[in-house]
Structure formats: structure tokens, C-alpha cells
Amino acid sequence: MTAAHGGPLAGVRVVELASLAPAPFGCMVLADLGADVVRVDRPGAPGAGRLAAPTGGPLQRGRRVTTLDLKSPDGVAGLLSLVERADVLVEAYRPGVAERLGFGPQVCQERNPRLVYARMTGWGQDGPLAARAGHDIDYIAVAGALEPLGRAGERPYAPMNLLGDFGGGGMLLAVGVLAALLERERSGVGQVVDAAMVDGSALLTSFLHGLLGTGLWAAPRGRNMFDGGAPFYDTYRTSDDGFMAVGAMEPAFYAVLLAGLGLADDPDLPAQYDPSGWDELRRRFTERFAERTRDEWTAIFADLDACVAPVLGPGEAHQHPHNAARGTFVEVGGEIQPAPAPRFDRTPTAQPSPAPDPERDAVPVDTILTTWQ
């Protein structure tokens, strides 16, 4: 299999050491933007190893794949031969593991001073927790990103692994790689990128810290403007057990929301920005949304600028007319997946190629090197 390349990163060569979600997502972004990404898998039969580092699906698309035993001298030698011709190496081992195996930053950059050596971890390369195990929920907990999530009086809820693994992890890794590549154009040398999920998750709370600094986020969880405390920024159940999302924060949009709900002329409705009336507003909105199905409310608000939208599942989002018109989702290898983003007018990205099969599509290092002259 040969991955198709097109986009602003065409010609950039990336070596990715197979790992879990954050680094593969960051490398997917790089591949989507045109980079030639070669994933280095560990040898072994399918089973536990594949569960530990999935080899299919959207996160693995757009790559070529080779297999190396990085615990053997020959495997390390093969990796270093790739490093000599690569622009970027991405690894997600715990701190010190790559050094112990013989392909840490110093060794690799001695071979290739222009190499961007990107490291993806949960806690970062230093600090008291650097060597500690963890997952998304742990990183966002320590970063202060988990505590604000949840209803008033209830425990924080686990928001999938979108914030730590992907938003604060893989996406920030990709940003770091791009920044280092840009800086290399000025300095002529690469550098180490230390991308930590706890750092990225903390960065995602920048807006919240701004609210805290101005006193606009002072109430307990679930009583603030953006955490479901405000009835005009929340979700509501419909008669068919669907949901509608409401984000009518500004008075102009709020007025249209009330019109769509048939509440515009209700003299007893509390004022929008009076928190003492929010419970009553929520009760009224809840009752009204429960009168119709999700599709009926979607039709009612289709032509109203009220900041109201249906809550779609990942299996149906591609069917929404707006997403269909923009091509927000694409079919890759018979599977519906999010399309590459963002979009570029002069250097558009190519249709992603399916994830390579490690057994069928793996190619020797020497074959890759012939294409990296």
C-alpha cells in the first residue's frame, strides 16, 4: 500500500513509533495534511499487541507501515536509517525508555541534526509524575479540566477521552511538530518537542481561567454560563428521547429561541440573565421541548437564527445536510470517517488512504529508503 499525499505538508517525512491514541491522532493529522508518515510496528502475532496499539480505523489512515524489533540491535539500526532521512520522529514511550533502547533524542539528532524529535506523554518529560502511569481522565483531572464538567451537586463526568488524548494531546503534538518544522527553516536544525497531555489539557482551560479572573465563574459547578447552569446554554430531551442543543446566549438569539418555542409572549417568563429565574426557565424549556420529536424541533428551527441544533450521534452526523454539503465526512475503505481539516485553497488535501494492514501492507525499511532519497 502506498499512501496518497497531497496538501501543505507534502514532502515532509515522519517516522511514527506505534502507540496508543494521542500520538496516532497527531500523526493522522500530519498525514491528512500531506506528510509521508511511516508507522513502525513491533513484530508479533495479532492479539494483545494489537489491542494495545490498534492498527486500523481513522487514527491509522494515510500511513505506510514497516515492522522493526526495537529491542534488538538490528531493529534499532533500521530505525536509525529511517531517522537519517526523516524530518520528524514521533514516540510516545515513558520518559527515558527511548534513550535506554538506543534511539533517544541525542542519538537521533547526531545522525540527523535537522530532525524534529516529538515526544508524546501524559505527564511530560519531567516533574514528580513523569514516570507515573495514567490515562486521559487522570491528566484532565490534574489539569483542572475535569472538575468543571458535570451538573450541580453531582460528580464530574468522564467526557470520553477527547480533551486529554486528542485536544490536549495529539492535536497539540501536531501543532508542536509544525512549529518546530517552521523554526527549522530559520535555524537549520531540529529540536525536541515535549508534548504532555496534562499541559495541553491545562491550555484548553485558558478561557475558563479568564472567567475566573474576572469573577464570571464563581458559582459551583453546574451554575455557570457555559457548564449547563444557564438554561439557554444546555440540552433538552425531546418526545422521542432525542436531544436538542441550545446555545442562545445573546439576547437577539434568545428572542428567536423563545419565538421558536412559542414562549415569546409569555409575560411570566423570567428574565434571561437573572440566575434566580434559571430553574423556572429550565422547567419551561424542558416542558416545551418534550412536546415534539427531535426531527420536528429541527424542522422548526431550521430557518431560525436561534443557535439551536439537533444532538447527533457519530453514526448519523454525516447525514446532516450541512455536513453532507461541505464533505465534513468521507468514506475511507468502506468506512465513514471525519474528513481532513482544515481546508486549503492552493494545496488541498488528498482523499485519505485506508489504514495499512500490518501483515499485508508492511514494507521493508530498504524499500522505504528508496523513496526517501
What are these regions (language model features)?
Residues G47-G56, P314-R360:
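Active-site-adjacent capping/gating segments
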Residues T238-G242, R294-D295, A339-Q373:
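An anion-binding loop in the catalytic cleft
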Residues G44, W123-G124, M197-A202, D240-G242, ...:
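Glycine-rich beta-alpha junction loops
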Residues M1-V189, V332, S353-Q373:
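N-terminal helix-loop segment corresponding to the beta1-alpha1 unit
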